[in-house]
Each structure stands twice: as structure tokens, then as C-alpha cells.
A protein has these predicted regions:
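Short beta-strand segments at enzyme active-site cores
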Residues: 2-9, 92
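Active-site-adjacent betaalpha module
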Residues: 15-146
Length: 146
């Protein structure tokens, strides 16, 4: 598999995502494995004032597969920033989530962002690719010849 980089948001003291608090902890099923990295950020953009770009350049990464929490904030901002940094961006359309907002349900927000990313035009004819998790796993299976 490819390298996994866990991006974790750090809030100010007293915030929901204050480092060390229960809300900040990664889900037990999402613990980094040996060789994975963790990047901590304080803004929606995972590239802004973090070591993410350096880690990716160090490994000669040119394609990112993105998933995560807060579709309408951190995920959207990072998708756009990754594209602006010239990466080939693939988003797991069933691999990002958010909460209901006063004006839209979480489901509507996710549907809107999947549509928007699919139709976002980038320089040089590049596009953001959206796949389901099943499609990604199917594409990653080695071909068998008998």
C-alpha cells in the first residue's frame, strides 16, 4: 500500500480539538502503523504552516488520495490546496464526512462537495478524481493470470 499520512487538527486551549483531549484523539481503528506519519495543523489547509509539503516532496509523491472529517472545512480546503500545489488529487467520495449545519444536512454537504470537486476545472485540463472506497480497493488488486 502507499504511505499514509494522518493529518490532525490542533485547536487552541479550551477548543473541541485541544491536543490531548478526548475529542482530539484519533479513533482507535485509525492508529498510525509503522512507517506512517502524522502532521498536526492549526488551519483548515493541511499544507499551511505544516511539514506536509516537505514530507511529500521527500518521498517524491505526486498523487494524493484524500479522505477525512469536516468535508466543508478541512477536507475541501485541503483538496483545493493539494490541487493548487500541483498534485494529482483523488478523493474518496464515501470517505469524508461532516456534521449537519444550520442550513444543510451533512448528507447534502457531502453530496454538494462531491459534485463540486468532480466539476472543478484546474489548469492544464487537470481534474480531481472521485472514487468510492470499493472502486479504489478493486483498482488496487493485482491482476491474476491463469
Amino acid at each position: 500500500h502507499g504511505r499514509v499520512i494522518y493529518i490532525q487538527h490542533d485547536d487552541l486551549p479550551g477548543g473541541e480539538l485541544e491536543p490531548g483531549t478526548p475529542g482530539w484523539q484519533l479513533h482507535p481503528a485509525l492508529q498510525p502503523a509503522k512507517g506512517d506519519s502524522r502532521v498536526r495543523k492549526t488551519a483548515c489547509d493541511s499544507f499551511l504552516e505544516t511539514e506536509l509539503a516537505f514530507l511529500l516532496a521527500e518521498q517524491s509523491v505526486d498523487r494524493l488520495i484524500l479522505c477525512g472529517s469536516n468535508t466543508d472545512f478541512c477536507v475541501d480546503t485541503t483538496v483545493r490546496s493539494a490541487a493548487a500545489h500541483g498534485f494529482e488529487v483523488l478523493v474518496l467520495q464515501d470517505g469524508h464526512t461532516t456534521a449537519d449545519r444550520p442550513h444543510l444536512s451533512a448528507e447534502q454537504i457531502i453530496e454538494h462537495h462531491n459534485w463540486m470537486w468532480r466539476h472543478l476545472h484546474l489548469p492544464e485540463g487537470r481534474r480531481i478524481t472521485l472514487l468510492t472506497t470499493d472502486q479504489l480497493l478493486e483498482a488496487a488488486q493485482p491482476a491474476l493470470a491463469c
